[in-house]
Amino acid sequence: MSMTETIKLYDRDAYAIEFEADIISCEPNKADDKQFDIILNQTLFFPEEGGQSPDMGILGGYSVVDVQIKNGVITHTVDISAGDCCEAEKEAGKQITGNEFEPEKVELAAGVHVCGKIDWQHRFYNMQQHSGEHIFSGIVHRRFGFENVGFHLSDSVVTMDFSGVISPEDIAEVEHEVNVAISKNIPIEVTYPSRDELAQLEYRSKIEIEGQVRIVTVPGYDVCACCAPHVKRTGEIGMLKVMNYQNYKGGVRISILCGFRALEAFRQKRDIISELMGI
């Protein structure tokens, strides 16, 4: 049976935290009998897609541990083991409301109306990373003509694979230019051009995409097809820091961190140095 595509509420508002939806399908997870795979009519949960890790949060009072998309249908995997997810639920609720939060669990079955809440900190940190990566990749493409041929955004690092070698000096210059763009607090634009408009548009990631193409533009720096949530202005990225780089498959692999994740990485480095120095 074919399933109707899930309505992507995160496309409409990347800053929304709570939503309501109807369960279309609820099936036991084949790998774990304490988990269920749920399909909703609409969702705020961004799935693992385009190299980015999925949103986490709460659905129907249970922890969402994975979100996947196939043929436009988004599947949420929830953990129903109370002992395993209780603390995670409370913490996610505290991040959302600022208060201690006891989620109300509901029956998980087709036809049931449920409430969902995304883990906002996780979502926003991912938005910072992805928007920073767009600016970095756009500058590399403009200056050197190289394509971003590999991208991965995890909870600990962002890696980008470029189609040509970039010297350490040039990488440092790109890093500086990205942070200049961040300091300008430029509005980031999301548009849905028609096929005719798209044919006339110069943008990165120009691959065959079925259906409506979503274009994310950082004026003066990057125009790229992208499905992920982004910050509204470059200033929200905070900062970008190159963490590592190495020659890779005839090009270069560059690792970066942005915003709060970059700050946390440098706090950890400071703590290590302080411990080694006996401070």
Language-model regions, residue ranges each:
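A glycine- and charged-residue-rich anion-binding loop/surface
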Residues: 1-279
